[in-house]
Curated annotation (Swiss-Prot):
It holds the Pfam family RNase_HII. Its main location: cytoplasm. The gene is rnhB. Keywords: Cytoplasm, Endonuclease, Hydrolase, Manganese, Metal-binding, Nuclease. Its cofactor is Mn(2+); Mg(2+). This is Ribonuclease HII. It comes from Bacillus cereus (strain B4264). PROSITE patterns: RNASE_H_2 (PS51975).
Length: 257
């Protein structure tokens, strides 16, 4: 075993699933520092995987409870973009299969952009159905952001390719006959809502990046329409766009000056 290089040991550890593996027992006895570091790394990785598995199982409790009642089509719903000064509010409704599993799934705001993009692609492949609802700044100004968010959520449900039997919604109640459960901080407590938050976030971010290309002086691709110092300074210099929400302060005050 001493003849195995560090690189070979690293590759072998990638194949090993549990401590009972004979190869693992041999590597445990290898006293080279490089090998022992790899063994420690393996333990940490397995610990992380176990925590992610437990977290995922905990986040599946709402879905599992409904499935035990014979409910199959469960739509998780979430929104992104209630707070920004520019751009639409975007919602997603996602129906997942019973065998859906993506370790590390969480509230989209807690994930790196790279992870969100990867999870977005995986959810697209695994989901039974995905619906997206987008409400423009003009409609937000007309009916207010709360009503616009509800409208976007209803649109997302309507855009599903199947009719959901139950809705799991992040902190909202919708005017629909479909049975629903409102969950505070649902994007961190339900896999379906978490998946919806990722679809909504990536969809909106891509739209704001396109807006950034159209209006490079505003830096939309950096702040996604939120009221950062950079964004407010750009509005002061270059003015208010159609994409801005005129009913939101401080834009409302700028227009009234």
């Amino acid at each position: 075993m001493q003849t195995m290089t560090i690189k070979e040991a690293e590759n072998v550890l990638k194949e090993i699933m549990n401590e009972e593996d004979d190869r693992f027992q041999l590597l445990m006895k290898d006293d080279r520092k490089g090998v022992q570091k790899l063994v420690l790394k393996w333990y940490k990785q397995k610990e992380l995987e176990q925590k992610e598995k437990e977290k995922f199982f905990e986040m599946s409790k709402y879905e599992n409870a409904l499935r035990e009642k014979g409910i199959t089509y469960i739509a998780g719903i979430d929104e992104v973009g209630r707070g920004p000064l520019a751009g639409p509010v975007v919602t997603a409704a996602v129906v997942l299969p019973e065998d859906f599993y993506i370790p590390g799934l969480n509230d989209s705001k807690k994930l790196s952009e790279a992870k969100r993009e990867r999870f977005y692609d995986e959810i697209k492949v695994q989901a039974i159905a995905i619906g997206v609802g987008i409400v423009s700044p003009q409609v937000i100004d007309d009916i207010n952001i709360y009503q616009a968010t509800k409208q976007a959520m209803l649109d997302a449900v309507a855009n599903l390719s199947c009719t959901p039997q139950h809705l799991l919604i992040d902190a909202m109640k919708l005017p629909t006959p479909i049975p629903q459960t409102s969950i505070i901080k649902g994007d961190a407590k339900s896999v379906s809502i978490s998946a919806a938050s990722i679809i909504a976030k990536v969809t909106r971010d891509r739209m704001m990046k396109e807006l950034g290309e159209k209006y490079p002086e505003y830096g939309f691709e950096q702040h996604m329409g939120y009221g950062t110092k950079q964004h407010l300074e750009a509005i002061e210099v270059h003015g208010v766009l159609d994409e801005h929400r005129k009913s939101f302060a401080p834009i409302k005050d700028m227009i009234q000056k």
